[in-house]
């Protein structure tokens, strides 16, 4: 798969992960040229960790991978949408989606795994 998006070296762009069947928004992360190349090469979502400053394969610690089905680019070519098959939860807090609570703090998602067990904190 070729990419029409060229991400300049050192630049990060937002990458939204969305369930390819339901349309549910799962998470927002950032991607650079290295992560995009690895995603295209493997078919598994890779992102750039801003906090760790390194490439990160989604699910490398938890097993909760994102199998990429389609990649869309926005009109300005400065954000991408990954349509994925989510294995397990997308959120490191144990929820299927990182968008599991309302602005006033009400929980609207369901926790599907215990992060303390998965990440052995």
UniProtKB/Swiss-Prot annotation:
Pathway: Amino-acid biosynthesis; L-histidine biosynthesis; L-histidine from 5-phospho-alpha-D-ribose 1-diphosphate: step 3/9. Its EC number is 3.5.4.19. Zn(2+) binds at residues 75, 91, 98. GO terms for biological process: L-histidine biosynthetic process. NCBIfam families: PRK00051.1. PANTHER family: HISTIDINE BIOSYNTHESIS BIFUNCTIONAL PROTEIN, HISTIDINE BIOSYNTHESIS BIFUNCTIONAL PROTEIN HIS7. Catalyzes the hydrolysis of the adenine ring of phosphoribosyl-AMP. Homodimer. This is Phosphoribosyl-AMP cyclohydrolase. It comes from Methanothrix thermoacetophila (strain DSM 6194 / JCM 14653 / NBRC 101360 / PT) (Methanosaeta thermophila). The lineage of its organism: Archaea, Methanobacteriati, Methanobacteriota, Stenosarchaea group, Methanomicrobia.
């Amino acid at each position: 798969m070729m990419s029409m998006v060229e991400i300049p070296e050192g630049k990060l762009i937002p990458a939204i992960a969305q369930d390819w069947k339901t349309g549910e928004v799962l998470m927002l992360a950032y991607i650079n040229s290295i992560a995009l190349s690895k995603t295209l090469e493997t078919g598994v979502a890779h992102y750039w960790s801003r906090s760790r400053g390194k490439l990160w394969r989604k699910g490398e610690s938890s097993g909760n991978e994102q199998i990429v089905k389609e990649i869309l680019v926005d009109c300005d070519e400065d954000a991408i949408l990954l349509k994925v098959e989510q294995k397990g939860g997308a959120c490191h807090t144990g929820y299927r989606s990182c968008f599991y609570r309302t602005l006033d703090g009400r929980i609207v998602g369901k926790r599907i795994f215990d992060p303390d067990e998965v990440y052995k904190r």
